[in-house]
Structure formats: structure tokens, C-alpha cells
Amino acid sequence: KLNNVKLKIWQEPWLDFMLCWMIFDAYLTEISNSGIDKKKLMYFYQNRNDFKDRILAKWSSLSGYAARLKELSPIYDMRPGSIETTQIDDENNLEEVFNFVYQIRCNLFHGAKNVKSARDAELVSRGAKFLRTAIDHWMKGE
């Protein structure tokens, strides 16, 4: 039964993205000893860690997902009053790609995604595929 639940989660991009982000966020919290998202991400970018080492070693298998995210760039910060955008200029730049995925996460977690919007659904779906593949590489030690 648990296997069926897992399969259904992976088939639903919105849930898939949230679950993948929670896994990644738990890892960031552990390595950074921080509870602040921006600080966790900066620690991830600026310090050596097994997650980053493994995904950089396999970046060629992730760059297609990153390029697909770049196609939807820029993404707007949907918080009220914000005019900020996040974009990917270089799909091989780990920091740009993860900042873009983080903005998808912020918009999704703060309620500014529309399940009826094809673009929002595509952002979430592509972000989930990228994160899931990165997590798979990390967990398998590839």
C-alpha cells in the first residue's frame, strides 16, 4: 500500500515538488545549522557538501532539466508588493538554477500558484523533475 501512495505522489507534480523540496530543505538545515532559507542556500553554494559534489559530478544528466526550466525564465516573486524576478541565464550555473527552483518553491508554498495555470503547472512539474533527479543522484551516491 505504501508503494502505491509513493507512486501517486510522484505522479502529482504539485505534491512531488513539495516533497522533494522538503527533503532538500531538511538536508540544507542539517548542513548549515540554520533555519533561514536564504542562509541555508548560501551555505550550500559556498561550502563543499556531498549533495553538491554528487550533482555537479552528474550535472550532464541534470542540465536538460535546467535548460527546460530556463525556457520558462524569468519567474516573478508573487508576494504582494514585490516586483522581483528570478531567471536562469546559464543552465549550467548551479546557483542560478537552485535560486530559480527556490522561487518556484516560494510562490508555491506561499499560495501564489494557480493549479489552472498551464505555465504554473509546467514550472512546478519541471522543478519537481529537476529536484527529484538531483535527490536521486545524491541518495544513490552516484
Where are these regions (language model features)?
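Amphipathic, Lys/Arg-enriched alpha-helical patches that create a basic surface
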Residues: 92-107, 119-142
